[in-house]
Amino acid sequence: LKSEGIGADCSSYTELLMSDAVGLKGHDIMFSSNVTPAEDFKKAAELGAIINFDDVSLIDFYEEIGAPFLETMCCRYNPGGNFTLHNEIMDTPKDAKYGMTKEQMKEAFTKLKAHGVKHFGIHAFLASNTVALGYYPKLARILFELAVELSKEVGVHIAFVNLSGGVGIAYRPD
């Protein structure tokens, strides 16, 4: 995968070690985790991975453990409510335990900016096993509108928007 220019989406220390073993480093690794042990954060920082904070409280924990704030960091957004497409509920972000509200995103970006972070990413994962063609355009609109708002209100550089996974497989033809 590395030779094809594909990186790794890691959520654990073991996955970080596996990425390192195949030569992935830096922005080739996105580290998204919740209930994250200190050693996982430190390993992700050591590898220069893009650390994707799932909860605003993790930023304080990250500071407490003495992990270095990197130039580029990311936060996971959860818009709440139901994520619908063509009157069909794709998933229910309001019930998800992952991600931050818009106000928490502002707080998180403000904290990260105060720690010297220069480039910010926004990530969201709103539905699983998605085969609907309109999912990614709708998700992109939500995230890019948020990016503009955060850039203006918090005064940060939004370096990227990550539409995450959730790609489904149509096991039977429609």
PLM regions with names:
Residues 1-160, 169:
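Active-site-proximal beta-alpha core segment in soluble small-molecule metabolic enzymes
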Residues 163:
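Structured binding elements
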Residues 167-174:
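A conserved active-site cap/scaffold subdomain adjacent to cofactor or substrate pockets
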